């Protein structure tokens, strides 16, 4: 038997609002949603991610099943390689700058093109003093180190959209023996940037280091035959796990399953994820019809791909929250 695994980040609602949100769906959409569970075994609940990664359990699942590696997902070196950077035998970390959007939520800050060289010149010496090297791809900042850090932090992608009242809790979303060292390093980088680019850094509220680890080819290779997702990092994991590029892709560019060898496949539909992250249940409701349309389309493509069954995995944070 061959299985299609449909991962739906943000599809499980918190218990406190689930009844009300589901009642707000149209009768037709609620019927379509209910039909997904008809004839299936009772759902099982599995905890896959540590508290620092609880907002992206689908990534924790992909990391474990594709790479056969335990622990927190390693993001930064694979994001670097997804941007066509070379594999380096060093520990990679992402350096992100954050600001607040007009609603007060945490948002990514990016330097303008003409400010990037000056920002790099300001940050690089500070990192070098700590035995690290600045790496830039596009507008993304990374740092590489041979020594490694005893440090873990919530992935920056999971912070974006955080409500203003929760931003004060940022210090609690990082851990490890090197936490103070990292905080001091980020403070010095921020100071150097503000000195070199006083006007361009006015909107920066802080810096964040996350996603660290080393990339390594997976052996034995994954038994999954194809992965379709809009997550470039997950696609890099899949490629490192031995799945050929021809059998990988994004949903926007694929309308049918790749002509891969017979075997299990993974497809991630993330239409609800951003709304779920923001607890924007009106947006969640509006996006549900599109998710159901996509899911029905791909289920209809299973037979030509020699898939005999499917598993629907609906992801959530803590179901009690």
Residue spans of the language-model regions?
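Acidic carboxylate-rich catalytic motifs and surrounding loops in phosphoryl-/glycosyl-chemistry enzymes
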Residues: 135-142, 208-210, 302-309
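Short loop/turn segments at strand-loop or loop-helix junctions that form parts
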Residues: 8-10, 95-101, 266-274
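Well-ordered, non-membrane alpha-helical segments in soluble/globular domains
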Residues: 25-26, 113-124, 182-189, 281-295
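An N-terminal, globular interaction/scaffold subdomain
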Residues: 18-117
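N-terminal basic/disordered segments at the start of proteins
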Residues: 1-18
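C-terminal regions of proteins
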Residues: 257-266, 270-321
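A contiguous, surface-oriented mixed alpha/beta subdomain in the mid-to-C-terminal portion of proteins
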Residues: 150-281
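A contiguous, mid-domain pocket- or channel-lining segment that forms the substrate-recognition surface
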Residues: 73, 78-186
